[in-house]
């Protein structure tokens, strides 16, 4: 495997089971979102992936974030694109290793993981069915120059954000819905009165959305 991961096997076994792939945020690790696993749909594999870049003294990132002298923040978009390709090849590997329904692959990303979930789904739509993007934003700079709207037409998105998020402003998150709808996609968009995190109601709402 090209990426380290934790896995929870489904409790209800089908010939092929859905998979929920969890992508953590900057500076975190695969154990963070895996705490959701016991509460997620029990017919699904739950796989929580560790990002490839080590941070000091601990934690991991999908791509570097740099600051200039004025504290402006810059994402390493080339690294981000490389991580998108890594996630796509990781999906190819796990569907060979486990009896996974390749038509039922969901990405659940938080923060930096959400940013990459958007990009992975729109770059490799044949591998993804649904995206849950928690506390992230839609980064146009890491998307393909040309998006085939027919190839992505099956994709469904659940997008949520905290209205008092100090890490990624809610205004950034709000741009995702019109951007995705302009591509002809269905988007469920929710806001919660919290900061940079996942409120219990947020979890409840995206879990119910997954079960539809």
Model-identified regions with their sequence ranges:
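Short alpha-helix in the alpha/beta-hydrolase fold that links the catalytic acid
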Residues: 34-36, 145, 169-179
């Amino acid at each position: 495997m090209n990426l380290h991961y934790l896995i929870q096997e489904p409790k209800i076994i089908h010939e092929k089971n859905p998979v929920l792939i969890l992508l953590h945020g900057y500076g975190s690790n695969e154990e963070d979102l895996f705490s959701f696993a016991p509460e997620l749909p029990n017919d699904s594999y739950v796989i929580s992936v560790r990002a490839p870049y080590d941070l000091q003294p601990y934690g991991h990132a999908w791509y570097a974030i740099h600051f200039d002298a004025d504290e402006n923040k810059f994402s390493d978009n080339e690294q981000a694109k490389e991580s998108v390709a890594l996630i796509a090849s990781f999906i190819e590997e796990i569907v060979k290793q486990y009896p996974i329904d390749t038509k039922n692959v969901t990405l659940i990303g938080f923060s930096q993981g959400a940013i990459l979930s958007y990009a992975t789904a729109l770059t490799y739509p044949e591998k993804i069915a649904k995206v849950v993007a928690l506390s992230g934003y839609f980064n146009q700079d890491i998307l393909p120059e040309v998006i085939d709207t027919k190839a992505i037409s099956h994709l469904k998105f659940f997008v949520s954000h905290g209205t008092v998020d100090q890490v990624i402003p809610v205004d950034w998150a709000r741009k995702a819905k019109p951007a995705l709808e302009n591509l002809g996609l269905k988007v469920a968009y929710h806001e919660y009165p919290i900061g940079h995190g996942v409120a219990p109601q947020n979890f409840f709402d995206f879990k119910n959305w997954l079960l539809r």
